[in-house]
Amino acid sequence: EEKRLPLALVTNILGGPCANSLLNVVVREKNGLSYNIEASYTPYSDTGIVAIYFSSENGNTAQCIDLIEGELRKLRTTPLSARQLSMAKKQFIAQLAISSESNEGYMLGAGKSFLTHDDVDTMEQVYAKVRSLTAVQLTEVAEEVFSGMSRLIYK
């Protein structure tokens, strides 16, 4: 439970919907190897899934995977700088604020939270939790989740 929010932020940094996500910059913009690349996190009551999706030409698949693994390694071993962490938190909070404007999306999230945790945080409580996250927390959760112990590749 205490790892859900740090993992959501790490996933957003890695491959969230903005053009400045790590994977988009490294795989798509710098190397021109992918048409699209993104990461998503789906939490469940007792586990969750982090998925990284990319589309590329067949000949670029191995190089894309190598670049992705390099970024995962960096997240596991090198804490974000204070500036990087601050920018990531601000961007994530802005994305949360925009997504909360959808009443349907907000109510679905609140219902899921209530069913799973018997509680619903206000948006201000969520923002405060995001602001309180540390670079060490993000590195620790990245080390646990991206350690390489589990990986499934669909081609």
Residue ranges and their predicted role:
Residues 31-33:
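Oxyanion-binding "anion nests"
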Residues 1-20:
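His/Glu-based metal-binding/catalytic segments typifying zinc-dependent metallopeptidases
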Residues 16-19, 38, 42-99:
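M16/insulysin-pitrilysin zinc metalloprotease superfamily fold
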Residues 35-40, 136-139:
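Glycine-rich, charged/polar anion/phosphate-binding loops
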Residues 8-10, 27, 52, 68, ...:
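Buried hydrophobic packing residues in well-ordered domains
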Residues 88-155:
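C-terminal regions of mature proteins
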